[in-house]
Amino acid sequence: MCRDTIAEILTSIRNAYMDRKRVVRIASTNITENIVKILFREGFIENVRKHREKNKSFLILNLQWNRKRLHKNLFSFKLKRISRPSLRIYSNSQRIPRIFGGMGIVILSTSRGIMTDREARLHGMGGEILCCIW
């Protein structure tokens, strides 16, 4: 059985937002750490900690709250998995999609590592489109 770790972390973050949880615990791998770093850098996640328990590493994510409203709703955003193990989607640097005219981000896996669509266009690189966030 093939485990899709990217889909698992996106689903756990999405479910935590829908259930109005503040903290999410996900399994730590190189891919998940790089995706979480991008989410943290782009402001979708408030804080990240690495936790070790019985020879297993976990990432503990504090989700971003919308502090501008009086009734403190969670900061809402959408996560969508694009390329999956059964159907890989690749794009060159000219054909990387723009989400809402640049308001959202696309996370790609390139030969230089996992990066956002803006970084990939800046370096002139394409790759596998992992997911979209808006």
Swiss-Prot record:
Protein name: Small ribosomal subunit protein uS8c
A GO cellular component annotation in the UniProt record: ribonucleoprotein complex
Domain of life: Eukaryota
Entry similarity comment: Belongs to the universal ribosomal protein uS8 family.
A GO molecular function held by the record: structural constituent of ribosome
Function, as annotated: One of the primary rRNA binding proteins, it binds directly to 16S rRNA central domain where it helps coordinate assembly of the platform of the 30S subunit.
Gene Ontology annotations of biological process type: translation
